[in-house]
């Protein structure tokens, strides 16, 4: 039968080189990846066979076999799962089914642990075999196809691969690794069992290896050796981890299971394992990762929760079980009530699925609330009676974890304000921000309320592109002068999210960059009277400024928020900030073409200089453009701005 040579997808050869060399010291992960792939292939067969039992042929017992041949220097991982046709072998093994190939290569850092984590995230687990092999041969036959339609795929990991049709009686796939000289350890049964026990013990299918026994040499003086008996034995527990009692599962086993389903190299931040009984019965094992994946901001990415029904795998991207803002959650949900032939359409419509989703969201939020509660826990808090509280080791281990979580996933969590009305109040309590009293995002709305000045009627905040821009915004000047704390919000999602949160625990949220500032009881009568008098005296100048800036500003008015700066830009109450409008335009989306309001400080020297100046028109435009620059924007015509400034400096 003729062989056909194909070239790898562009960049794959380079990627193989990087994978091989950047992960060399973590080479045992290849076995984790290949066993996981074999298990997935069996899961897929089981799912397809729900509607076509003939796919089982004469082998209904699904399993993974691992064998080695010292003479040939090969290690083989075989499954009797769904298998591949010739075209599927070309499609699945000759290309990387991710648009992020270049991202993968760019993110390889030389840090062995971090790079190992990327392997599974980018869907390149199969290629990790080249860490230990200088050639890989794959033989496969798809379930349901005749034996004559088997396929052999082979590559040395360079620029191309060969494919040929073969006779293959057995359904499923064999991955044959031709080991490098320095991968001798993987021709040792003890080593292979150790790696399987470490990474794949939880796999619900049996993983089989040939039994070995010690045999003395028949020749005097020669050492004995381990020989294969021809019998096969199961070398893993072969039971789904989530079905076992919690008391029988160690933290290490929970962590290893997480690494297997998430392809993450790091331990999770926390997890929750529960059996829920009631109107609908299901088991959930949910994890919160310690690090954000590379594609966290891809809202179309598959959800990280696998769905099982009565321990039968159904799908691994069950987005109906977890909302988009919790797309970082990994884990397993096993339902006792859903039909085995559940479709995606049924998932979206099922009452049971809605109950499972609601329960799972509440479980995740409870995990986060628990971490947040212990984040600031004093290891030895002194009580009112002078006796130090004893902090448990479990509580001590949670300290600092919410800060770690929020640094990775806080911005995504904010999306929930607009997506999950039922849990909006719980989500609001979990949010953290920087403020004028703290550069780190550690201030909750509750913290802010507890520090509000007497007579303060609102929670004040400002949105900006960067922390520096927020901290130095002219719009904060009157708040700094009066010692009023302002929350500093610098995530792109902030302003959008806060459209869905008008108040916190009855206290309204107020942007310092929207509408007129009314400090209410925090402003004494003398200040109010002086501001009114200044506005009245400045009316003629305001009229001239409005006329000069009629194409740029919706209005010009005397400020109540500036102390040291000559001017600032604000928008009307309920309007879109100039920052959000810029972000939308940068993303190629339409934004309302609303003009901002220019507020001027009549006490500033530059503003006073306007009166009677022959350069009034130029100064007015400079005033506007500088206010725009101060909030992170750019003048509409930078060249004209520079020309005006130069003319005044000359």
Swiss-Prot record:
The record's principal subcellular location, in a coarse class, is cytoplasm
Q: Which GO terms describe its cellular component?
A: cytoplasm
Output the superkingdom of the source species.
Answer: Bacteria
Q: Does the keyword Phosphoprotein apply?
A: no
Q: List the InterPro entries.
A: HATPase_C_sf (IPR036890), Heat_shock_protein_90_CS (IPR019805), HSP90_C (IPR037196), Hsp90_fam (IPR001404), Hsp90_N (IPR020575), Ribosomal_Su5_D2-typ_SF (IPR020568)
Q: Which UniProt keywords apply?
A: ATP-binding, Chaperone, Cytoplasm, Nucleotide-binding, Stress response
Give the location in the cell.
Cytoplasm
Name the SUPFAM superfamilies on file: ATPase domain of HSP90 chaperone/DNA topoisomerase II/histidine kinase, HSP90 C-terminal domain, Ribosomal protein S5 domain 2-like
Gene Ontology MF terms in the entry: ATP binding; ATP hydrolysis activity; ATP-dependent protein folding chaperone; unfolded protein binding
**What does the protein in this record do?**
Molecular chaperone. Has ATPase activity.
Quaternary structure, per UniProt, is:
Homodimer.
For this chain, the family text in UniProt reads: Belongs to the heat shock protein 90 family.
Protein name, entry field: Chaperone protein HtpG
Q: Which organism is it from?
A: Acidovorax sp. (strain JS42)
């Amino acid at each position: 039968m003729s062989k056909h040579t194909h070239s790898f997808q562009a960049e794959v050869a380079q990627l193989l080189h990087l994978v091989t060399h950047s992960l060399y010291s973590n080479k045992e992960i290849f076995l984790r990846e290949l066993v996981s792939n074999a298990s997935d292939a069996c899961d897929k067969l089981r799912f397809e066979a729900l509607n076509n039992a003939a796919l089982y042929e004469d082998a209904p017992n699904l399993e993974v076999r691992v064998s080695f041949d010292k003479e040939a220097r090969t290690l083989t991982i075989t499954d009797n799962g769904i298998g591949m046709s010739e075209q599927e072998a070309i499609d699945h093994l000759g290309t990387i089914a991710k648009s992020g190939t270049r991202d993968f290569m760019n993110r390889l850092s030389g840090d062995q642990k971090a790079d190992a984590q990327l392997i599974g995230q980018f869907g390149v687990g199969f290629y990790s075999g080249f860490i230990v092999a200088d050639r890989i041969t794959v033989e496969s036959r798809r379930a349901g196809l005749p034996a004559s339609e088997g396929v052999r795929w082979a590559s040395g990991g360079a620029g191309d691969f060969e494919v040929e049709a073969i006779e293959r009686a057995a359904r499923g796939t064999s991955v044959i690794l031709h080991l490098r000289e320095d991968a001798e350890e993987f021709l040792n049964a003890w080593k292979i069992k150790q790696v399987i026990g470490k990474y794949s013990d939880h796999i619900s299918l049996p993983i089989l290896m040939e039994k070995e026994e010690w045999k003395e040499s028949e020749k005097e003086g020669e050492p004995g050796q381990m020989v294969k008996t021809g019998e096969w034995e199961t070398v893993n527990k072969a039971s789904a981890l989530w079905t076992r009692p919690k008391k029988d599962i160690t933290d290490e086993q929970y962590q290893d299971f997480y690494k297997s389903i998430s392809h993450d190299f790091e331990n999770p931040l926390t997890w929750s394992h529960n059996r829920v009984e009631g109107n609908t019965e299901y088991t959930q094992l949910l994890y919160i990762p310690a690090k954000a994946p590379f594609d966290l901001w891809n809202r179309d990415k598959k959800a990280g929760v696998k769905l099982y029904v009565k321990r039968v795998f159904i799908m691994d991207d069950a987005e109906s079980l977890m909302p988009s803002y919790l797309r970082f959650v990994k884990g397993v949900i096993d339902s006792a009530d859903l039909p085995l032939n559940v479709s995606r359409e049924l998932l979206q419509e099922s009452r049971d699925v809605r109950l499972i989703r609601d329960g799972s969201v509440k479980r995740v939020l409870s995990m986060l609330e628990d971490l947040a509660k212990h984040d600031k826990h004093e290891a030895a808090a002194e009580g009112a009676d002078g006796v130090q509280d004893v902090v448990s080791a479990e509580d001590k281990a949670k300290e600092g974890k919410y800060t770690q979580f929020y640094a990775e996933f806080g911005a995504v969590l904010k999306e929930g304000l607009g997506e999950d009305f039922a849990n909006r109040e719980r989500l609001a309590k979990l949010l953290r921000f920087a403020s004028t009293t703290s550069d780190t995002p550690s201030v909750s709305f509750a913290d802010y309320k507890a520090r509000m000045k007497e007579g303060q009627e609102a929670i004040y905040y400002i949105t900006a592109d960067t922390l520096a821009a927020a901290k130095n915004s002219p719009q904060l000047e009157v708040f700094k002068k009066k010692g009023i704390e302002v929350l500093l919000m610098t995530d792109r999602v902030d302003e959008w999210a806060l459209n869905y949160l008008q108040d916190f625990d009855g206290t309204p949220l107020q942007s310092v960059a929207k509408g007129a500032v009314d400090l209410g009881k925090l402003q004494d009568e003398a200040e109010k009277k002086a501001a009114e008098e200044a506005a009245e005296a400045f009316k003629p100048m305001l009229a001239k400024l409005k006329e000069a800036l009629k194409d740029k500003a919706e209005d010009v008015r005397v400020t109540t928020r500036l102390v040291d700066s000559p001017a600032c830009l604000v928008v009307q109450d309920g309007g879109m900030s100039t920052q959000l409008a810029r972000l939308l335009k940068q993303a190629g989306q339409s934004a309302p073409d609303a003009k901002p309001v220019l507020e001027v400080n009549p006490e500033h020297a530059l503003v006073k200089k306007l009166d009677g100046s022959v350069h009034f028109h130029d100064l007015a435009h400079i005033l506007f453009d500088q206010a725009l620059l101060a909030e992170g924007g750019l003048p509409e015509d930078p060249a004209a701005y520079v020309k005006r400034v130069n003319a005044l400096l000359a």
